Curated annotation (Swiss-Prot):
UniProt keyword DNA damage present: no
Gene Ontology cellular-component terms listed: cytoplasm; exon-exon junction complex
A GO biological-process term: mRNA transport
Name the record gives this protein: Protein mago nashi homolog 1
Cited InterPro entries: Mago_nashi, Mago_nashi_sf
Secretion signal, residue range per the UniProt entry: none
Molecular function in Gene Ontology: RNA binding
Length: 158
């Protein structure tokens, strides 16, 4: 695992993150998945077969400061203190998976797709699921920004 040096609020040490959300339905297996790998590689995949779309795959290497920001987001969310035992089980609507390694802590969550905050509020563990819901929103925004910026910026010609 990679070592994330510096004061990231997350204790430094090893870091790995993987998020998946998807379902199998009318258009086949549709999903969004991204992971921050130990070597700094950010992998992103988005598969939608709607109107015969093809899978989008992107890979970029990110700097240690980007990894520090990801660990800060996770640490501040306090998701590492949560337990998914009272969260909705994956169903025909879909599933979400979140796996995180930070330092010597390793968590893995699995739950159903969350359509809105109403789904969160009516669950058996609204506080824990709310933390998960907002963390996932933050991580998606972070990853989409990194991927979009990386592939839209033109290199400087010398």
């Amino acid at each position: 695992m990679a070592t994330v040096a510096g004061d990231d609020g997350g204790g430094g040490g090893e870091f790995y993150l993987r998020y998946y959300v998807g379902h199998k339905g009318k258009f086949g297996h549709e999903f969004l998945e991204f992971e921050f790998r130990p070597d700094g590689k950010l992998r992103y995949a988005n598969n939608s077969n709607y109107k015969k779309d093809t899978m989008i795959r992107k890979e970029v290497f990110v700097s240690p400061s980007v990894l520090r920001e990801a660990t800060r987001i996770i640490h501040e969310s306090e998701i590492m203190k949560e337990d998914d035992s009272n969260w909705p089980e994956p169903d025909r609507v879909g599933r979400q998976e979140l796996e995180i390694v930070m330092g010597n802590e390793h968590i893995s969550f699995t739950t159903s797709k969350i359509g809105s905050l109403v789904d969160v509020q009516t669950s058996k563990d609204p506080e824990g699921l709310r933390i998960f819901y907002y963390l996932v929103q933050d991580l998606k925004c972070f990853v989409f920004s990194l991927i979009n910026l990386h592939f839209k910026i033109k290199p400087i010609q010398s």
